[in-house]
Amino acid sequence: ILVEWNQKMNLTGIEDEKEVFIKHFLDSISAVSKGYIKNGMSLIDVGTGAGFPGMPLRISLPDLKVTLLDSLNKRINFLQEVANQIDIDDIEFIHGRAEDFGKDENYRECFDIATARAVAGLPALMEFCVPFVKVGGHFVCLKGPNANLELEESKKAMEVLGIEYIEKIDIKLPEIDLDHNILVFKKVKN
């Protein structure tokens, strides 16, 4: 579906089906491997774009309550069409900006998990995502080869936002030599 729609509108720079599967789907569900994201939890995917990692996480965990947030309506329309085609009717789709919805009492501190992938540098990403997370919940972000540097640059943001660094998980994807990481943080205060 993604490859087909990508011909009409730019959703991803990756167009080969096998690459889409490995770099988008497998990369997205790798966040499940350590048990931070489980069935029964509530998750918001901030800046979801073409639905990564939120949509693959919902497909692989059918009882995960997922909210997909993106500032571009064309992406939200695409994701609604995908959900219809694969018969998933319990995802919430939000067209809007994280900065606005993170202040909304209907969304602020309402989620067990906030995720993001390829949205912004880590300090800004924390400011976008952490307001959605309940105290005791986690911010789980997928980052590339500069994860350690971004982590160093985020110490002040972590302190201000009330989160603690838990771990960096190195991700190895089949047939592709990419340096991908998952950074996990726990919200300890609001």
Language model regions located:
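Conserved glycine-centered beta->alpha loop in an early N-terminal alpha/beta scaffold
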Residues: 47
